[in-house]
């Protein structure tokens, strides 16, 4: 595109011509030089071509020349612009034709593409609509679900309260190791106890004893079971002292204690063993060995003919002695057994296992040996 350059050059030439101080005018014969068949009859009068023009003549000549140049400039500009416009029109025509042919050729392909994309566009619109619905539902959910959530929480609180009540009832009535019955001692009383009648004589040089206990209260000495004769009321005693377990054989001086093995209100499986051969003695709580010693009532023999009781001790049983209320047991007892030998570790653990209440001692067997409840003691299941 040279149009701006041409216009600039033309305008610059006109300005230079108009502002020039000196004009060298040359006379031009403007008569028509075409031969029209007429010939002059006389010679033309000679003129002085070098006649100097007046100021007015110079001015008119300058104006005439300026108008001529302006006309020429306008004509040239018009020609240039017309040519440029024609060239641009032709170029645009070629471009339009070139673009029309590919578009016409690609029309069916574009139509097929649009038809293929229409399902995708529809699915996109549907997905956007579903997302908007979900967002709207999520925004309204707290208001809609708070009442329902409150009802659920209230139901959970009631269920928890009911569950606590059931657990409390089960804790009061549940019996361990599959035992079906227990002896309940409602309070400490010198009249409340159980008398045991062994199936075999209590003449022992070794023994093992196990018992399930759930105590409601424990003092300095709370008897679980005791065996005594008229000469020695302390032949065998298993009792609680606060949270400790104590086993006595042959007298008060021969005792073994294990500290912190019993919890009030919870079932505990307690065992004790003794052998006269080395005076070995051991205590077990819930299947674990908690205390052991030797040289306890070594070479001693437990005589027969005494009284075996649970939940109480009879001081001087055969010479008019009585029961001591402060030694009485309160709570529940079940699974009381005595063997005339020392059980192995496996046997002791098995005697406190699940459904172990069918394991019975050969001297006293729970559910087989007669145990009479006295005072307010009673069997419960």
From Swiss-Prot:
Keywords: Disulfide bond, Glycoprotein, Secreted, Signal. One of its GO terms (molecular function) is virion binding. It is found in: Secreted. Residues 179-381 form the Pentraxin (PTX) domain. Glycans are attached at residue 220. GO terms for biological process: extracellular matrix organization; host-mediated suppression of symbiont invasion; negative regulation by host of viral glycoprotein metabolic process; opsonization; ovarian cumulus expansion; positive regulation of nitric oxide biosynthetic process; positive regulation of phagocytosis; response to yeast. Residues 1-17 form the signal peptide. InterPro entries: ConA-like_dom_sf, Pentaxin_CS, Pentraxin-related, PTX3. Plays a role in the regulation of innate resistance to pathogens, inflammatory reactions, possibly clearance of self-components and female fertility. Homooctamer; disulfide-linked. Binds to C1q. This is Pentraxin-related protein PTX3. It comes from Mus musculus.
């Amino acid at each position: 595109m040279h149009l701006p350059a041409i216009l600039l050059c033309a305008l610059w030439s006109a300005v230079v011509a108009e502002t020039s101080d000196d004009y060298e005018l040359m006379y031009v014969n403007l008569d028509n030089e075409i031969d029209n068949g007429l010939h002059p009859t006389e010679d033309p009068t000679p003129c002085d071509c070098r006649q100097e023009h007046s100021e007015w003549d110079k001015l008119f000549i300058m104006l005439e020349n300026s108008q001529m140049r302006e006309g020429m400039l306008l004509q040239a500009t018009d020609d240039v612009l017309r040519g440029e416009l024609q060239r641009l029109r032709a170029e645009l025509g070629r471009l339009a034709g070139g673009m029309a042919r590919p578009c016409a050729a690609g029309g069916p392909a574009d139509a097929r593409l649009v038809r293929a994309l229409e399902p995708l566009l529809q699915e996109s619109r549907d997905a956007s609509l579903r997302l908007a619905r979900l967002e709207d539902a999520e925004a309204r959910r707290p208001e809609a679900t708070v009442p329902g959530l409150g009802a659920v929480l209230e139901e959970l609180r009631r269920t928890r309260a009911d569950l606590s009540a059931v657990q409390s009832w089960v804790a009061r009535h549940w019996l361990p190791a599959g035992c079906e019955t227990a002896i309940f001692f409602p309070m400490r009383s010198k009249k409340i106890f159980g008398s045991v009648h062994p199936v075999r004589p209590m003449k022992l040089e070794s023994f093992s004893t196990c018992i399930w206990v759930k105590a409601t209260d424990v003092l300095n000495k709370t008897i679980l079971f005791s065996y005594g004769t008229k000469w020695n009321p302390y032949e065998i005693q298993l009792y609680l002292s606060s949270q400790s377990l104590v086993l006595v054989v042959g007298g008060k001086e021969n005792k073994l204690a294990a500290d912190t093995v019993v919890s009030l209100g919870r079932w505990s499986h307690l065992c004790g063993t003794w052998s006269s051969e080395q005076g070995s003695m051991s205590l077990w709580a819930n299947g674990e060995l908690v205390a052991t010693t030797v040289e306890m009532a070594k070479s001693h023999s437990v005589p027969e003919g005494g009284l075996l009781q649970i939940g109480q001790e009879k001081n001087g049983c055969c010479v008019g002695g009585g029961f001591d209320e402060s030694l009485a047991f309160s709570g529940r007892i079940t699974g009381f057994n005595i063997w005339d030998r020392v059980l192995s570790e496996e046997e002791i653990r098995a005697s406190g296992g699940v459904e172990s209440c069918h394991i019975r001692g050969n001297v006293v067997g729970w559910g087989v040996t007669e145990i009479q409840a006295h005072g307010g003691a009673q069997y419960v299941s």
